[in-house]
Each structure stands twice: as C-alpha cells, then as structure tokens.
Amino acid sequence: MLGRIEGFSERIGSIYGYTKVGIVHFKAFPDVARGEGPIAETLAKIAEDDFFTAVEVGWMRDPRVRNGARKLLEEAHLAVYYATQPAMLTQKLSLNALDPAERRRAIGQVKNCIDEAYDLGARAVRLIAGKDPGPEKRPEAMKLLVDSIHQLCEYAKEEGEIAVVLKIFDRDVDKQNLIGPFSDALALAEEVSKEQPRFGLLADLSHFPLLREKPEEAVPLVRAYLKHAHIGNCVMRDRRHPAYGDLQPRFGVPGGEIDTEQVADYLGVLWNNGFFHQEEMPVISAEVRPLLAGEREEVILANAKRVIKEAWALFQRSRSL
C-alpha cells in the first residue's frame, strides 16, 4: 500500500531523469529466446518506440544479425544491456556446477556472451547462477560461483569497461537457483566485490513473492550493490494456473502477484534506498511476455508501458501527500 515516502521536499519529475527505462527483448518477443528467429524485426519495433531508452538483449547466434542489431541500436540511441540467461538456460549450464568440466563449459559460454555484448555495444552483462545443489553442497557451490564470477569480471576487463551484474532468482519454486535469498546475494556480492568493485546485483520485483521476501526488507540488505532492477509479474498461489512459477505474465493477470500498485511501491523502496541516485544512471526494465492463449506481443508491451507510466505517477503523488 502506498504511503508517505521519506526524505523529499520537491516534485520528482520525469522518470527519465532518474533511470533508463528498458524492456527485455527476448521475453517481450519469445520467438527470439534461443538466439534465432525474427531478432532484427522485433528489435526494430522497440527501436521505433521512444518510450524505451534501454533494451536488454540476449543470445544472437548469427554474427551478421549482431552487426545489424548494433547498427540499429546505435541509430535508435538505445542503451544496451546483455543477458546471458537465454544461452545459459537453454543449454542447462551452471556457473556453480560441481563438475569441473561442466563449470568450464559454462564459463566458456559466458565469455562468448561477453564477446557478443561488446559487439552489440552493451553497457553491462547480466549473469545467472546455476541450480541450488542443496544445503550440504551449497557452501562449495557458492565458492565456485564466486570464482566463476571473478574469472568473468577479469575477462570483461580485457576488452574494455563493461559492468557485470548477477540477477537474484528464486530458490525453491521455479528456477531453484543458488542465488537465491537476498541474504545469500549479499554474502556473494560482499565476497566478489573485494576484487571486483564494479560487480553488482539485479533485483526483480516478480521474484520477491517467489522468495517469500518483501522488497522493503530485502532491498536495504543489498542497496550498496543494487545496480539494475526488473519489474514483472508472477503466479505462485495456484499450481494449476498456466502462468504458475517464474514465467513473467503480463501485469494484472488474474491470479498474479504484481500490478500497478505493487510497481509503485517498489519504486518507492528503490528511491528510499538510493537506487535512483547512483553515479551511473541505473536501468529499470519490464520483463513480461505474451503467455496466455490469444495474447499479442504488441498488447503486452502496451500493458507494461501503461503500468510504468501510472506507477511512476502514483509514486510521485505519494511523495506530495
């Protein structure tokens, strides 16, 4: 429920003065999620829409497609961020795999993703941890993940400055990820940042219900490392629901957890924890997709834009009450 937000004395103004506003390309247009399909055509739809000032892209297997995408994104003046998630999940790769050969393969794939990110002019690369091996092997998996991230941060430095960010997922509902609860994300970030000060975290609004955590309690834990944010929706109360789990349905889907009011509240939590006042402008991206029968990509995009506009307005209003 929106309430009065701390530390304000003036009207905030446009969202664009505080953050890049992005969309996750391979979720908005699921046909490109495996690194193939109508990548150029769907990216063009985002490039033509001046609501978005950033785009999160993923795997593009064809170098010619990447070259065309870079040209398009430069022309559109879009900030670009690269997600390794499509390449990693489709191949079932894990940066914390206990098997050395499997972990080497995962690290190799992410290095290829970093190369792609440079080709596309990306400002940051987003990582995903692997499956949680269970409580007994969790400490070992955490050490392996720290080592993998360190290797990848060093690799990213070889060609230039590109930020490396890890996204926080659920532990036991859908992705069953090592990272995981926000307390574990904090421990990881503290360890990695000892040698990699640019390393950061990404918090997704749709994952708080899946983690059974509240943004107002979890975000302060990681505020020093929180660089990016996602807004999305999830269904978790009914296992029979076709959108159950971490499937990124549209905002306001029946049975879902997130709608405009929750997004507005999240913006307030981020504001109170300094997210919008970083030295380098952050990015908030909508991660939603057409999921239920008959849903159209263009309508789901419009849904997300309306929610962002209204949520920011509600957030502004809460600061003037």
Q: Model-flagged regions — what are they?
A:
Residues 19-27, 53-57, 78-85, 125-127, ...:
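Hydrophobic faces of well-ordered beta-strands that scaffold small-molecule active sites
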Residues 1-112, 118, 196-198, 302-321:
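N-terminal pre-domain/capping segments
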Residues 10, 255-277:
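A short, acidic, amphipathic alpha-helical segment used as a generic capping/interface helix at domain edges
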Residues 238-252, 278-297:
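Active-site clefts of carbohydrate-active enzymes
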Residues 55, 156-253, 315, 319:
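Acidic/histidine-rich catalytic cores of soluble enzymes
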Residues 3-12, 96-200, 303-304, 318-319:
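Active-site acidic/histidine proton-transfer and metal-coordination neighborhood
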Residues 29-36, 54-69, 133-136, 172-178, ...:
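Acidic-and-aromatic substrate-binding clefts and catalytic sites of carbohydrate-active enzymes
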